[in-house]
Amino acid sequence: KGEHVAIMGDNGAGKSTFVRQITAVEKRTGGKVWFNGRYVEFDGPLAAREAGIETVFQTLALADHLDVPDNLFLGREKIRFNLGPFSILDYKGMREATLAGLRKTGVKIPNISNTIQHMSGGQRQCVAIARTATFHSKLTIMDEPTAALGVQETAQVENIIRTLKEQGEPLILISHNMRQVMDLCDRIVVWRRGRICANLRKEETDGQDVVAYITGAKTQEQYAGAA
């Protein structure tokens, strides 16, 4: 708990597939998933989300025509009361929860009533990340969260990740950015050809060593089958 773990590997190594399988976006063909101390079998992404796993994918699942609260609560809206077959939404409650989530992560959105289509790439990414705080996730997974962002927007997202670390929020970060990984994570798991080939503590390795595992020049003894 509270650990930030990076997953690294070359293109096609299996990083994103791993994430899609533990969140039940794809069905596994083998293996088991242990989450929060117990074996789990999610029947779909909604079940994984309800268990407390929030995922920020490379392609953000945001609705351009909706504002920030509506995006955060899309598919899990707060209900004030039901009126026959109709539900009356608690817009005030959703707005307050959105502001609380933004404060918790340090996300700065000038006007949460703006629709997503009028926001920068960095602001969009921050909105996606803020969902993890709004719904008190037990695990946050970020798949290349800064891949398409500029320098300033990348710094903003990285500051949010640091805030999550300070608050003891566990994180899995998929990234090709060595500087980012060494700066933000406690442990680095390297994938190659669909298998783990190294599990490294940050303080016991360096960028050159990690690259050697990624390229196949090295493989940890316990993962010799991945060579």
Task: Locate each region found by the language model.
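Glycine-rich phosphate-binding loops of nucleotide-dependent enzymes
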Residues: 1-227
